[in-house]
Each structure stands twice: as structure tokens, then as C-alpha cells.
């Protein structure tokens, strides 16, 4: 894209909206299944994911301010950081969520390899991997929720 600031702003807004929705759902799920421990569990999961999120934000700012010619790296780096955040939070989530972490890890490095050919910042390198990753996460959490609800 020819407008890196618009790219960064758009994806930052998408990340914030996504984080808010995840927080609301995580809190509701935690209250349903772990009523007394809900706040502690949500806080612990957020604390484990937060370093990856902060690193992604700082990477974006640093590359934009000091090395704008390398902004094409951001989509792949963000995906790798999301994978690390998921792996860090995995012990509080259903085991199958590790597959989502693996998806983002592989997708991130694939995006870096593909982007290295022309060094362009494309919305597709963010959109496609995140739609697949978030859909996979939603499906796995839904399946895990059904399994938990079915237990006596």
C-alpha cells in the first residue's frame, strides 16, 4: 500500500476492536465456567499475552519512524508475535488452541518469505492469515465450550 500510516492505523483499530471482543467473550466464558476465579483467570491470560502485543506496537512505531522501508516486514512479524502470545497464554486455554499458535507462527514466516520478493506492504498479508487464524480460534473455542457444557 502507498499509505503506510493508513495501513498501521487501520490494523491497529482492527486489533483493538478484536482485543475488546476477545476480552468480553473471555470474561463471559470464564464467569460461566469458573465463576469465583473469573477475574484472576482473565487477568492472568491478559498478562501473558500483553508482552507480545506491546512488542508488536513498539515494532510498528519504531519501523515507521526509523526504517519505513522495512514496514513490509510488519504483517509477518505481527503474526509471529501473535503466535508467541497464544503459546504464552495456552495453559489457560483449551489444548487445541496451540494449533492456532502454530498457524500464526507458520503464516508469519510464510508472509515474510513471500514479502521479501517485492517488499510491498499488502493488506492481504494481514487479512487472509488473520481471518483464517481467528476463524480457527473461534471454531476450536466453540468446540471446547460444547465439550465443557456437555460434562455433568
Model region roles, listed by residue range:
Residues 1-8, 61-73, 114-122:
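Helix-coil boundary and interhelical linker segments in multi-pass alpha-helical membrane proteins
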Residues 1-58:
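Selected alpha-helical membrane-embedding segments in polytopic membrane proteins
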Residues 21-40, 84-92, 135-142:
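C-terminal ends of transmembrane helices
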Residues 17-18, 59, 82-85, 107, ...:
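Membrane-embedded alpha-helical transmembrane segments of multi-pass integral membrane proteins
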Residues 29-33, 66-67, 144-149:
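Membrane-interfacial segments
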Residues 1, 18-27, 52, 69-81, ...:
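Hydrophobic alpha-helical transmembrane segments
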Residues 88-152:
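Terminal transmembrane helical module of multi-pass membrane proteins
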Residues 40-97:
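Membrane-proximal helix-loop-helix units in multi-pass membrane proteins
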Amino acid at each position: 500500500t502507498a499509505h503506510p500510516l493508513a495501513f498501521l492505523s487501520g490494523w491497529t483499530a482492527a486489533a483493538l476492536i478484536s482485543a475488546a471482543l476477545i476480552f468480553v467473550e473471555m470474561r463471559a466464558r470464564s464467569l460461566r465456567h469458573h465463576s469465583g476465579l473469573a477475574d484472576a483467570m482473565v487477568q492472568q491470560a491478559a498478562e501473558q499475552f500483553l508482552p507480545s502485543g506491546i512488542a508488536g506496537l513498539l515494532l510498528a512505531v519504531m519501523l515507521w519512524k526509523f526504517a519505513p522501508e522495512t514496514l513490509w516486514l510488519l504483517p509477518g512479524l505481527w503474526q509471529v508475535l501473535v503466535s508467541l502470545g497464544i503459546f504464552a497464554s495456552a495453559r489457560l486455554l483449551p489444548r487445541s488452541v496451540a494449533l492456532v499458535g502454530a498457524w500464526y507462527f507458520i503464516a508469519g514466516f510464510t508472509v515474510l518469505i513471500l514479502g521479501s520478493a517485492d517488499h510491498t506492504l499488502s493488506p492481504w498479508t494481514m487479512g487472509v492469515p488473520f481471518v483464517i487464524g481467528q476463524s480457527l480460534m473461534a471454531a476450536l473455542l466453540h468446540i471446547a465450550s460444547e465439550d465443557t457444557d456437555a460434562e455433568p
